[in-house]
Amino acid sequence: MVCSPVLLGIVILSVFSGLSRADRAMPKLADRKLCADEECSHPISMAVALQDYVAPDCRFLTIYRGQVVYVFSKLKGRGRLFWGGSVQGDYYGDLAAHLGYFPSSIVREDLTLKPGKVDMKTDEWDFYCQ
């Protein structure tokens, strides 16, 4: 089978343009955040979702009512209504934990694990879509 250079070029461009759309920096929700440690690697608290929330884009988490949410950061300033965290997949791990943001109003914090007192700047990786 002979493939024309134009067709080959279109195929290559479509593959690479799809990758660039998936991996990209998104607009920052806030300039500062509160974390439990300097790396934001320790959860601040555990919370339970009070209602479903469907993620509007790749920066956010889709959360279902009753799910346990691990809160890793709390945005400050213009993004203060959003927290960052993760929800676990099912018990057997079919779904990997995914980090993202969600409205703080849809969860109830049930257990504080470590106070979120470390005030730090957000960076482009905090809002990067994979």
Curated annotation (Swiss-Prot):
* GO CC entries: extracellular region
A molecular-function term among this protein's GO annotations: growth factor activity
> Which protein are we looking at?
Melanoma-derived growth regulatory protein
Name where it mostly resides: secreted
> Species lineage, top-down?
Eukaryota, Metazoa, Chordata, Craniata, Vertebrata
In the UniProt record, the signal sequence range is 1-22
* Complexes and interactors: Interacts with FASLG.
Q: Which UniProt keywords apply?
A: Disulfide bond, Growth factor, Secreted, SH3 domain, Signal
Task: From the Swiss-Prot or TrEMBL record, state where the protein is found.
Answer: Secreted
| Induction or repression | Repressed by retinoic acid.
Q: Where is the SH3 domain?
A: 42-112
* Organism, as annotated: Rattus norvegicus
Q: Which InterPro entries match?
A: MIA, SH3-like_dom_sf, SH3_domain
Disulfide bond sites: 35-40, 58-129
* Biological process terms in GO annotation: cell-matrix adhesion; extracellular matrix organization
